[in-house]
């Protein structure tokens, strides 16, 4: 997994730990009331541990989800039943976006593809004629 490579790559410095409520407010999940837990990192389902956050966005990872050691998981309402009781669920309808945003907080110097909302359809530009 790409996210896993980012986590073990020595060129990317983890700036954590962060308070869970800080992370959730930073990604606009303000209606949640979670404890003041410190989160050390964001990792994939397989390599995550206690005091880390992970994510589940597809049913094909349900077997990994059942075994995760993460304290928290970003997921949708549809997938929360795949997680063990030891992993607290954070419900979102934007799992991958929120995962990317939290990853950027932990690894601000990593290379990212920030969404460019200035991009236009080629038919709306001068390049159409070329």
Q: What is the meaning of each model-derived region?
A:
Residues 2-130:
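Domain-scale signature associated with acetyltransferase and cell-envelope carbohydrate enzymes
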């Amino acid at each position: 997994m790409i996210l896993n490579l980012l986590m073990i790559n020595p060129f990317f410095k983890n700036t954590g730990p962060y308070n869970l409520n800080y992370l959730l407010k930073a990604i606009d999940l303000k209606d949640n009331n979670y404890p003041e837990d410190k989160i050390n990192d964001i990792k994939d389902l397989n390599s995550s541990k206690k005091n880390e956050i992970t994510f589940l966005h597809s049913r094909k990872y349900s077997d990994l989800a059942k075994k995760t050691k993460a304290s928290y998981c970003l997921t949708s309402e549809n997938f929360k039943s795949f997680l063990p009781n030891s992993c607290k669920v954070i419900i979102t309808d934007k799992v991958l976006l929120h995962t990317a945003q939290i990853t950027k907080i932990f690894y601000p110097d990593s290379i990212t593809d920030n969404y460019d909302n200035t991009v236009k359809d080629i038919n709306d530009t001068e390049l159409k004629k070329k």
